Amino acid sequence: NYDKNFLRF
């Protein structure tokens, strides 16, 4: 799973 911070983009 990707970082939550990355998904914010």
Swiss-Prot record:
GO terms for biological process: neuropeptide signaling pathway. It comes from the Eukaryota. GO terms for cellular component: extracellular region. Its main location: secreted. Keywords: Amidation, Neuropeptide, Secreted. It is found in: Secreted. The modification Phenylalanine amide is found at F9. Belongs to the FARP (FMRFamide related peptide) family. This is FMRFamide-like neuropeptide FLP3.
